[in-house]
Structure formats: C-alpha cells, structure tokens
Amino acid sequence: MSITSKPVQLVRFRWDLSAIPAEAGQLSKPFVLRTAGPNEIEEAMAIVLASYNLDPEWSGCALHIKDNVLPGVKRALTKEPTCLFVQHGNRIIGASVYDCAPEESEVHLVSGACVQTEYRNRGIGGALLASTLEALKARGLTEAFGHTRPNSPSAKYLCPKFGGTKMAPVVAPPPISAAAA
C-alpha cells in the first residue's frame, strides 16, 4: 500500500529589481560573499540540501526538494555559475542559486537564501537575498520571482524585504517519484 502525500503548498513572491537599494547586500565581517566557481556544483547542492533538510518549515517536503528543487539547482548551475556563497573562514555557510532565464512557470530564485541553521538570524539570509536580486538586476532583469512555504519565517520576514510582494499561492508540481508510484 502506497502512502499518498499532500501537495506542497507554496507562496510566490515578486521583486521589482529597479527598487533594490544599492547597498542592500552588505555582510559584516567575518563573513564573505563570493560567486561560486563552475567546479563547486556539489558544494552548492550540499548547502542547499542541508538547509532544507534542517528547516522545520520544509518538513514533509523531501520529495519536492529531491525532485524539484535539487534538479532546478543542478540545471541552473549547469547553464552557468549562478550561485552566491557566504563563507565564514574556510567554511561555506550559505548559498543562493539563481536562474536568469528560467523555464516557463519556474522561478529566478531557484534555491532561495539557504543558510546553515547555526548561522541564521544574523542578517546573512537578507544579505544573500539582496545580493542575489542585485546579481539578477546586473544581468538585465527587471523583476524576479521566488517561492517559499506559506506562513514560514521566510514568507513573513525575509521575502518581503527589498519590496518583495506576495502573490497568489501555488501548488508545487507533484514529485516525479510520487507520480511514478
């Protein structure tokens, strides 16, 4: 007997990139923001996966993460190195993968601002989000879209930063492995 899971509910956010403040993505020392290199796909995937797995808001969404988020990360990074890392010393503690030209119905903020749990609530997620939006703006985009869980701390506090406006809720596509079952 197979166990059916409820569809993953998401909320979509939109940012007008012309309204992003110029100095929004500043990080305080000892944290360093840098662009990930083309050979760092595995590191980006590991940070994104750990961030989602350890976030209680994404509990019960393992198939969505495995079948939708991680392939989106890999697709975006295979096209070009569009990932920002936050480092603390030699350790990568945060990542944000973005796609400048997503497929229809996809989002620009593929992973969102993923920060290791022990480094959260220090302004790192906000700086990572702002820097990602600035990177998209620098590539000529005028607006960006992203998804998160409804009523989560990211939906309440992070995504509204820098002019993020909540749009209609969406249901994530069914995971590939669930559809095949």
Predicted regions: what they are:
Residues V115, N121-E134, A138, Y157-K161:
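Conserved acetyl-CoA-binding loop-helix of GNAT-fold acetyltransferases
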Residues L136-T148:
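Conserved GNAT acetyl-CoA-binding A-motif
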Residues P56-A113:
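A conserved beta-strand-loop-helix scaffold within acyl/acetyltransferase catalytic domains
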Residues V32-A46:
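A short beta-loop-alpha structural element at the N-terminal edge
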Residues K161, T165-A181:
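…primarily DNA-binding HTH/wHTH and HhH modules…
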Residues A44-Y52, V73-A76, L136:
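Hydrophobic alpha-helical core bundles mediating ligand binding, dimerization, or RNAP-core interactions
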Residues M1-K6, G126, P150-A168:
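Conserved active-site alpha-helix within GNAT-family acetyltransferase domains
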Residues M1-P30, P173-P174:
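Acyl-donor-binding surface of acyltransferase catalytic domains
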